Curated annotation (Swiss-Prot):
Residues 115-137, 167-236, 284-366, 415-487, 549-576 are annotated as: Disordered. PROSITE patterns: TRIAD, ZF_RING_1, ZF_RING_2. CDD domains: BRcat_RBR, Rcat_RBR_RNF14. This is E3 ubiquitin-protein ligase DDB_G0292642. It catalyses: [E2 ubiquitin-conjugating enzyme]-S-ubiquitinyl-L-cysteine + [acceptor protein]-L-lysine = [E2 ubiquitin-conjugating enzyme]-L-cysteine + [acceptor protein]-N(6)-ubiquitinyl-L-lysine. Zn(2+) 3 binds at residues 704, 709, 725, 728. Zn(2+) 1 binds at residues 616, 619, 639, 642. Zn(2+) 2 binds at residues 634, 636, 661, 666. It comes from the Eukaryota.
Amino acid sequence: MASVELEQQVDDLTVSKVTPFVEKNIDELNSLVQLMFTPSAPDIHCTQKLSKSQNTKLIQYKIRLEKTRSRILVLIDNYITHEEKLSHFLGLLDRIDDILTTIKIMSGEDEELNFTLPPTTNNNNNNTTNVLESSSDSDYDIIQPREFLKKSKPNLILSTKNSLSSLLKRKKSKNQITTTTTTTTTTANNNNTRRNRNNNNNNNNNANGANRTIDTSSEDDDESISSSDDDIVIGSRRSRAATISYLPNVPRANPTPINGRTPTPSHNFEPFTINTFLNSVNGVNKTSTTSTTTTTTTTTTAAGRTNKTVNRNNNNNNNNNNNKRFEIESEEESETDISSEEEENNNNNNNNSNNNNNSNNNNNLKLKTKSMSFTKNGIPLKIRSRINSESESEPENQLAESYELGKCQRKHISTPSLRLSSAHLPNTTTTTTTTTTTTTTTTSPKSVNNNDDDESSDSDSSDSEIENIKQTIKKNNGPPSPMTTEIIIGYSGHSKRLCNRYSLPTVQKSFTKQQLHEEIINFGRTPSRIKQSFLKPVNGDAELVFEYDDSEEEEEEEEEEEGEESDSESSSGSEGEVIVESFGIEKKVLRQYIKLKKEMEDRKKVSTKLEEPVECKICYMEYDQSNEVFTLECDHVYCFDCITEHLRILITEGRVLDISCPHPQCKKEIKESEIYMLTNEKNWLKYQKFSMIASLKTEPIKWCPTPDCDTPVRGGSERNPILNCPKCSNDFCWICGEYSHEGAKCGTEAMELQGRKNKSIESAATAYIDFLESNKHFVKPCPTCKSHIEKHDGCNHMTCINCQHQFCWLCMNPYQSGHYSSNEYPECFDRQYYSPFVPDTYTPPPPRRRHRKLKMAKKITLYTAAFTVGAPLLLIGGAVLLCVKIHKHRKNRARRNRNVGLY
């Protein structure tokens, strides 16, 4: 019951809920992990430090994170074209993968997560210690927790490019490792075994039927012995499986003595890189601490036969390793090597001439692609990668560099770690072939060629081996087998599910930047179509190869790619590189898509003429050019003008939750990638804003009270009421919505403001109810969300702007196509534009023109009365004032004349 509730809770996670859910579970795990890392006795395991209830919680939180990870993959599929959300989801995947990997390492749940310690072998001891037994006899050293539980990206994986290059440079400068690759032929006397000579060079020269030439450098005997011992242990199946897996470098603690045995000192493995993987496949072990010489050889094995490869040992301790059999098949030569082998068998040339011919052939070799195939439990596995033709001397380093710099972009599917053992290869024929353009090691089942049984009986002779090589070359010249899968290193769960469910035909293409962008857009647009028509449920394997042609890439972009790759490698967990299981696009390709998405505006579509004209379902016009129409995921075709206008209307009205196909009988939603392609920048910004508002309606949020800030803030409670706006950095109260008043309750001013708000709300509610009662024929509630809708004129087909529900205004039933022409609704028949009858109780408002005339008449009457009464008064008053002025003037003049006469 709890699991069902958990699945329901995870399925209900939206874009805004997934991040807090992950943060909460990681915070809970933080306390448990800290307890597991507390110092204690060395014989106490990490899981024994927790109580029973704490262990139960640890398992529950782990299950939650695993289910949340699958939910995030679904969200990535939905938001494949959204840059910010996509980057955020990829970061969450990195954190979840790191914490799950750490928990598996500490609890020891997964067998592949256990690291084994290479035992030390004495010169006088003839028995080699079993790695599987030694791995279970001791505990690991307790490592202090790193900052993987913080919000920043963790640095758990050590196999980044910078650390790899620095490690290789340090080893080269200190140990001066030299590598010499030689290839010789196989005669009838040898037993297809690889042997190394002792420090005395005469042992190899005097050996009968010797067919391998190995150059070794003179170093200290003790150091060479220790390096050979490390090679033996790492060459075993157990250590090879641990070396191939994408796991962090975990040092091992010095265990206590068990059964009187001396504990093995601590030893650190070299972190996994592409070089390590290729060396493990080719049989090259670079874990020695002294200068050694590496030899790469080729062997041919018939059906039912096992190659016995003996590791290098300076003390001739080869007979003790017969129980640890494993196959190493590799080839780095051109087709001329095979011809040189035939000439040697016929002419009996010496080994020196053979080495000279091989060196000359290497100089003329121009490889374009390197492919290797291996088999685990009868399943063919294949890896392909690009190598530089100018660097034949170090193809493995070039392969690692090209892989790490993103030179070969591929769809990766997780498969189990390879264990190259003959025990897992019953009834198989392993043949190494070489061509001028491709070097491939193929593994074919026994049923492919019926003559393999006859040839295996005479496999000791060189003639039969040469014939096997020729037949295999002829078979390889044909089309590739569709039952091949691309080799991937990592966790085994996903590969098993994929191999049991799907089989994809081989798809191999080279893309430019523009073509890669279009392919990813197609993947994001039609994943369901791919799953229906491209994936077929059969018991087989799958290969989906996407090679990225970087011929147009500039050198200045390499640093950015290195930074992106280092982030992806450092954040990868037990699955290697995190993949998107829904449609098989890995994170590197997603980051490339984010980068190339910005170039979409400048991309010009090439117009091609269609075989048949296509009719638009909106304007019913026919179009014969491909750039004039657009096909939705539901296969409905519309012209660009109609579908663009349809999206513009929906976005402008805020109906972002109901953007679906315009066809009346189709309700399939239009994806964000299609909306982005069909809208301009202005409408796209509106769509994003309205989508955010629609998602925030379901969240417990508070809006910032700052006038110039419209930021929603989530969180807050009665105990912690203070919220901080991330935009304006102002604190406000979660309870009253006013500015922060920390240390005191909401004051009287806030309470008075709340009282005024309540009064205004009550008065507004009363007025609204009165309005509804008086206009009940023009205002009706939505049948779904009960939001009131007012209608005065127009069509009776209504759409609620709040919930996007479509209904009939007359009968209030859900609207369907042909509603007003159906006999099921007789009251609505042929009444699509019918207006209801308005009763006599309704009094329409008076016309506005009449009111204006009355006001104008009043003004004219008032002005006329004022002028009639005021004009006489003004005339009389003016005459009186004039008479008074004249009288004063005469009186003053008479006074002046009288005064002049007196004097």
